[in-house]
Amino acid sequence: MIPENPRILLTNDDGIRAHGLKVLEKIARQLSDDVWIVAPAEEQSGAGRSLSLHDPLRVRRFDERRMSVSGTPTDCVLMGIQDLIPGKQPDLVLSGVNRGQNIAEDVTFSGTVAGAMQGMQLGIPSVALSQAYGFGKDDPIQWETAEMYGAPILRRLFDLKWPDDVLININFPDRKPGDVEEVEVTRQGRRDQHILHAEHRVDPRGMDYYWLAFKGLLSNPPDGVDLRAIYDGKISVTPLHMDLTHGETLGNLKRMLGGVPPKS
């Protein structure tokens, strides 16, 4: 359980200047007055769980409780907890609010989810928050949806003791607050990965280059998964964990390969 007036560490992958981080700070300040921010100096979307192993990390302090790090979300949470926040460690890590949904296999690319995952690995309850957009074509991002529902959902989570190896992934739909259908607790879904592709272009000098891009296509996911919930205008809440072992295959492999190593 999370204590009253918890110490909260905020991070993201869109960078210290991102609007979604401002939304997250508004959410956090509805829950506590002990809020700290350690976020990447520059955008780190798609960074996943990468660490900065080949470059020095530089910290810029905007004030006592607001800092940027010239690294990834994982770097930020690691340094925030171990080096930058004095006194007791945070009671809660919040990562987001991401500009765009983090659902299905996207969670493995996501720096937002990675920030929460690093907090979880350091023994701190952690939550990733993302605001879906792009389903209404040219409609603006509905930040007010995350802002309205973020704190009430987190308060409910405060009363839940979830396992130490689990983080909570919250995605808000591309709907105005009054049009949100409901909250659905979901499983991680699976999308058609052919939607992600390399888009070929030619620069003014005739040289080829590429941008990674998503085709504007929707899959047809089953009920009960995060994709379907977001498509249906629901808030998706998904428990994620680090153990990627596939249980059924593990048993099959033990029966086939367990014991004395084969020689032919």
UniProtKB/Swiss-Prot annotation:
EC number(s) reported in the record: 3.1.3.5
Top-level taxon: Bacteria
Binding site for a divalent metal cation: 13-14, 45, 98
Keywords from the named record: Cytoplasm, Hydrolase, Metal-binding, Nucleotide-binding
Subcellular location: Cytoplasm
A single GO molecular function term of this UniProt record: metal ion binding
Assigned protein family: Belongs to the SurE nucleotidase family.
Protein name per UniProt: 5'-nucleotidase SurE
